């Protein structure tokens, strides 16, 4: 199937937009570049500004064996939770060497099969720009990354590095779409949810609510919550997020207050359900 490959080359805002008229129940299709047509002055869009990191590293042992390290989460500077392949052939204490003089020591295998990996030097996020690869989502069926992947699978407003997969709902926005939203009087607010490896986990349960989601780190600024609770300039204005799949509803039912979290940085395993 060539559709996933073709989709990656499509203009961002040419993606299809599913439109539901909540008053009539009628559904239709449009393109995302026209999303401003379905919003009203004073509406506020909450957007995830996470930035995808080059989480996949290819290295080798001193014996010459190839090793792949897929970074998941940084615990302390230089110490990461990661997937190591082939795990059975990488014993605890094994040194893995990467390009640019970067090395890492593999720790014990954790109960879930993951490993702690300590890097030298410890400034891993800076190192990734030169030695890492961006992880391709499973629906992109090719073995190796292409030069445009890091741009294509990054939102135009990506800011805080830490995700191993793009927040796909945000990929449809362009500067032109934002210009149209600005002209319409639609506000924007940003929060951060670092999309983790669990997003690739298939649903293996009959009951959706029984599907367990890996915790993901998020940062919810107080100013974002305040933006959602600020009095709207006109009746009926709403606060809405970029949905998991392109969708838009109208008319909206009213501004939705969002509460700031007690800590600036924490994690969640909450999942949206229909």
Predicted segments with their positions:
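Surface-exposed, charge/polar-rich loops and edge strands
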Residues: 1-274
């Amino acid at each position: 199937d060539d559709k996933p490959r073709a989709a990656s080359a499509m203009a961002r805002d040419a993606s299809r937009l599913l439109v539901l008229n909540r008053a009539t129940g009628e559904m239709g299709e449009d393109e995302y570049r026209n999303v401003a047509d379905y919003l009203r002055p004073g509406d506020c869009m909450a957007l995830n500004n996470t930035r995808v990191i080059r989480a996949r590293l290819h290295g080798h042992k001193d014996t010459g064996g190839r090793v792949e390290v897929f970074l998941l989460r940084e615990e302390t500077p230089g110490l990461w939770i990661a997937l190591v392949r082939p795990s059975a052939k990488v014993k605890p204490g094994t040194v893995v060497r990467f390009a640019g003089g970067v090395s890492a020591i593999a720790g014990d295998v954790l109960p879930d099969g993951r490993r702690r990996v300590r890097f030298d030097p410890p400034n891993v996020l800076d190192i990734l720009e030169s030695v890492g690869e961006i992880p391709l989502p499973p629906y992109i069926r090719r073995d190796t990354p292409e030069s445009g992947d890091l741009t294509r699978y990054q939102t135009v407003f990506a800011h805080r590095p830490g995700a191993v997969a793009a927040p796909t709902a945000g990929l449809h926005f362009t500067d032109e779409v934002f210009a149209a939203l600005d002209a319409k009087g639609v506000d924007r607010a940003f929060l951060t949810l670092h999309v983790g490896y669990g997003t690739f986990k298939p649903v293996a349960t009959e009951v959706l609510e029984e599907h367990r989601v890996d915790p993901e780190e998020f940062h919810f600024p107080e100013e974002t919550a305040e933006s959602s609770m600020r009095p709207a300039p006109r009746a009926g204005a709403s606060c809405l997020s970029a949905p998991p799949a392109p969708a838009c509803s109208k008319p909206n039912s009213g501004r939705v207050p969002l509460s700031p979290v007690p800590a600036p940085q924490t994690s969640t395993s909450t999942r949206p359900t229909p």
